[in-house]
Design a protein with these regions (language model features):
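Membrane-proximal HAMP signal-relay module
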Residues: 2-95, 110-118, 122, 152, ...
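A conserved beta-strand-to-alpha-helix junction within the catalytic ATP-binding
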Residues: 60, 161-176
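Conserved micro-motifs of the catalytic ATP-binding
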Residues: 155-160, 193, 197-201
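Short conserved segments within the C-terminal catalytic ATPase subdomain
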Residues: 181-190
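Short helix-loop "hinge" at the ATP-lid/N-box region of the Bergerat-fold HATPase_c
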Residues: 216-217
């Protein structure tokens, strides 16, 4: 009898406990699975294209950590998609610009070549058409070279070899190398000032300064002046190329560094440029974490500047050179 009563008592105790344990198991299981289930639903919705916010709700530490990881992954993916879209748009614009710019010299070459087939063409016109073909061929060669240079810089924005560069020495070398061209255009050129050394690719920086000096030489009058000024400003080494030409009027200075931008439809072709020189300067500056700027001078003429972060004075030579 006592054994039977003990069994009944055990059942009366175990049954409620079992019910409580079962209910607690369901509650805990729901507490554990619901955050994971919500995260799974958000992930599925995001995979289908929905813009779902991934924010931790504090219900479960592990789920919150996983949510934060997913949030970072989503942000990284969105940034990569954005960067890819920008790159694709630039490629489309580049191809469109190339097609447009190549059409002009090719049309001129073909048209004048067809005129040369005329057996009754006077000798004077024959020489004229030949000169046009030669000039347009040279322009086409320069354009192709600049296109390849710009594309190389934009596709590989970080210079392959970075080393200490003395901009004053580099600017002087550029002016010396351009002496025949500057002399032909009767340009009076002066290099002045000093700037702290920078960490950069010497060939790329030489190209940038060359383009700025050549650009200035195209828009000065015979006997005009070009000044290459160097200075250290707010932690940057600045190269400013000034001329006493006609300036660029009311044009937005930022537009001057766009590919193929011209303030005058015939201006660049008439001066032998390709419309890519300043765009190359901008790309080189940005590849060195630098900036470009253009402004009209109060006394007349224009100033084009490139600013590159200076090497701090306390940095040793061993820490400067990088490949």
């Amino acid at each position: 009898m006592l054994l039977f009563d003990a069994s009944i008592l055990s059942l009366l105790v175990l049954v409620p406990i079992s019910v409580v344990v079962f209910c607690l198991s369901l509650l805990i299981g729901h507490f554990l699975s619901e955050p994971l289930s919500d995260l799974a639903k958000k992930t599925a919705a995001y995979r289908n294209g929905a813009d779902i916010p991934f924010e931790p709700d504090g219900r479960m530490l592990e789920a919150d950590r996983l949510t934060v990881d997913f949030k970072q992954l989503v942000q990284t993916t969105k940034q990569q998609q954005h960067d890819l879209a920008i790159k694709e748009q630039r490629q489309k614009e580049f191809i469109s610009d190339v097609a447009h710019e190549l059409r002009t010299p090719l049309t001129a070459i073909r048209g004048n070549a067809e005129m040369l087939t005329d057996p009754d063409l006077p000798p004077s016109l024959h020489d004229k058409f030949c000169d046009i073909i030669v000039n347009e061929s040279e322009r086409l060669s320069r354009l192709t070279h600049d296109l390849l240079t710009l594309q190389r810089i934009e596709n590989s924005p970080i210079p392959e070899e970075m080393q200490r560069v003395n901009l004053r020495e580099l600017a002087s070398n550029v002016v010396d190398a351009l002496h025949p061209i500057l002399q032909d255009r009767q340009a009076n050129t002066l290099v002045t000032g000093e700037a702290p050394d920078v960490l950069g690719n010497p060939d790329s920086l030489r190209q940038a300064i060359t383009n700025l000096v050549e650009n200035a030489s195209r828009f000065i009058q015979p006997g005009g002046h070009i000044t290459v000024e160097l200075a250290g400003v707010n932690g940057n080494s600045v190269v400013a190329v000034k001329d006493d030409g006609c300036g660029f009027g009311d044009v937005d200075p930022k537009l001057l560094f766009d590919r193929f931008y011209r303030t005058d439809a015939s201006r660049t072709r008439g001066t032998g440029g390709t419309g890519l020189g300043l765009a190359i300067v901008k790309s080189i500056a940005e590849a060195h974490d630098g900036t470009v700027e253009a402004l009209n001078l109060p006394e007349g003429g224009a100033c084009f500047m490139i600013a590159i972060p200076s090497i701090p004075a306390d940095i040793s030579e061993k820490k400067v050179t990088r490949k």
